[in-house]
Amino acid sequence: MHTHTSHGIESDAMLRFHKSPVSALEPFYLPSPFVVNGEPLLLASLVSADENGWVVWWDLGTKRPLGTWRAHESTIVTVQQMGIHWDADVPQLHRNTFGKLLTHGRDNCVRIWDLFRVSSFSSMDWNLCKVLHKTRDTARNPDVYEIPVNALNFCNVATRAEMIATPASLSSESFDIYVVSNHRLERLHSNVDICQILQQNQRSNETDENRKFGAIMQITWTGDFQLAVGYESGIVACIQLQERHTQVVWIDSSHLTHPILGIVSNLDRVFTCSASDRIVVNSLQTGKTVAISKIKHKGISSLDVTINNSICLVSVTTWDGFSRIYRYDEDSSAAVDEALKGVFIPWTKLRRIPPKVIPNFKSSSNHQTIDLPDLKGRVIKLSKTQNGCNNALVERSDGQSKMILRSSEKRALTRYAFVGYQDGRVATYILCDS
């Protein structure tokens, strides 16, 4: 375990299981025995996935797996907890799907797994659905049902409440919407084509060819019936789903010609990244661009956003294998453009500490750098915690309700940064209060 601290972040641990490059990470929130002002708090665990289809569910307290299983026959593109979404630091739970995990692989399948069930939402009592064996040879899958999807491109799958958005079964330029209802999957919208919708609604002389956006690369929910979709062409579109038709709310072309590689919605803002070196921030309501930052590292392959003590942190992993965290501020005097009020301020650069004994490494001529391809970061994720979970108001709900948290319990409820690496390891960091 490392103890190095840098600018509000502390190295925590290195998790080892995967034999293939890590391809996806997801903080997975569990009920906890803690409350603040009578409200139950959630405890973060972690789900990691790799290019060989394996999933590991990690206990962040013990740094050991709660379960391991092979979920897909090839690379896992998406892992996402169902039944929860966050409004800043306030979690919204959905009873029908809380406790389920969605995985999406390049084997053309989306699978939904039952990991735990809440027996009482008033007391947040819960139990594991099935004991998951911890070794590869005896790994046994949790309960599951699945959806066949198009995996011709690397588009993710996104879920909110009981809704699931997937690439369309027949076209890479369209998407489908499913709902989980009574342990069944129903398709609500089929083959939604944004270019076709714009063509039907256009009042200009634009041709069909000018309306082609290319394959869908990224999709995320921005509201209960609203999505942001990123395309191969660099276009980002915000879509409002309605019962009889779909409305295009706004379109942004700040990334034009660079495929969209990441979309995150937070605090009435939509953050996007692409194969360029740009991070763009748009107003969720109007689509107005409020920030464009060139971070000078092309190919932003992973993007996430969290709020840490009222500070907006934006994390990225780039094609050079490094992970970086920026502080995003719309009230900064550093803004140089009145129209673009948001600025990105470098916060920290995450460096994985290599082992002391490194076989077959190559050093540069000046002996200042080490060429270690397996140390390249692939994906970064930031966890969330509820407002007030790191102060003395946090109590236990098991009869010792006035007991102030011990330091170890506070640590278990803190915010994390996770980085998945090319060699299959996952580094965990703690986002400090200061």
Swiss-Prot record:
Keywords: Chromatin regulator, Nucleus, Repeat, WD repeat. GO terms for cellular component: nucleus. It comes from the Eukaryota. Gene3D superfamilies: YVTN repeat-like/Quinoprotein amine dehydrogenase. Its main location: nucleus. It is found in: Nucleus. GO terms for biological process: chromatin organization. SUPFAM superfamilies: WD40 repeat-like. WD repeats lie at residues 17-68, 74-123. Component of the ASTRA complex involved in chromatin remodeling. Component of the ASTRA chromatin remodeling machinery complex. Belongs to the WD repeat ASA1 family. This is ASTRA-associated protein 1. It comes from Komagataella phaffii (strain GS115 / ATCC 20864). The gene is ASA1.
